[in-house]
Swiss-Prot record:
InterPro entries: Class_I_gatase-like, GATASE, Imidazole-glycPsynth_HisH. It comes from Pseudomonas savastanoi pv. phaseolicola (strain 1448A / Race 6). This is Imidazole glycerol phosphate synthase subunit HisH. CDD domains: GATase1_IGP_Synthase (cd01748). Its EC number is 4.3.2.10, 3.5.1.2.
Length: 212
């Protein structure tokens, strides 16, 4: 039976993610902060919620920045929400925070003056929204284009390499909803809260060989 490590650095909706992975038959799911267990896992999930400064402080304190770089190179790796944002170069949250830098780009604030067709939009972006599939990727298998996923975020990803953008969202402006590079896949939305389509994505991740 394969092992899926859900990285625990004290910030994240870990049990919901783990339960969803178990529900789709992902194998032995371990919530862990043990570097040895993470290194030995067949797949790795990197969730996150909260302020990026606090997240990055814990990630660096535990040495998980280098660990994430290492384990995401040679096995299926999934970043979720702030776990996705932490993979970028830098976030402008909290006055500016350097991140892990696996995906080139910036994490930017939606702003207080966000409008769509004259309507003022509330920030954070919270609720269901469509994701346009920019390319065909194994994790989109059996998920229709423009399927709706559940989002909660005040900061969005402005990707520097558009070829890595595999899913796009729109909330007053266009943003990267999903990024991919080799065995790495990352989503801004919460698949564990996104019902049928979110569970399908997790099931696809559990079956994915990491190739793209």
């Amino acid at each position: 039976m394969q092992t899926v490590a859900v990285i625990d650095y004290g910030m994240g909706n870990l049990h919901s993610v783990a339960k969803a992975l178990e529900h789709v038959g992902a194998g032995r799911v371990l919530i862990t902060s043990d570097a040895k267990v993470i290194r030995e896992a067949d797949r790795v999930v990197f969730p996150g919620v909260g302020a990026i400064r606090d997240c990055m402080a814990e990630i660096r304190r535990l040495g998980f920045d280098s660990l994430v770089r290492e384990v995401s190179q040679d096995r299926p790796f999934l970043g979720i929400c702030v776990g996705m944002q932490a993979l970028l170069d830098r976030s402008e949250e909290s006055g500016g925070v350097d991140c892990i830098g696996l995906f080139p780009g910036q994490v930017k604030f939606f702003g207080k003056d966000l409008y769509e067709e004259g309507e003022h939009l509330k920030v954070p972006h919270m609720g269901w929204n469509q994701v346009a599939q920019a390319v065909d990727h194994p994790l989109w298998h059996d998920i229709p284009d423009l399927a709706r996923f559940y989002f909660v975020h005040s900061f969005y990803i402005d990707a520097a390499n558009q070829r890595q953008v595999v899913g796009r969202g729109h909330y007053g402006l266009d943003f990267a909803a999903a990024l991919a590079d080799g065995s790495r896949f990352a989503v801004q939305f919460h698949p564990e809260k996104s019902h049928t389509h979110g569970l399908q994505l997790l099931q696809n991740f559990a079956a994915w060989d990491g190739r793209w």
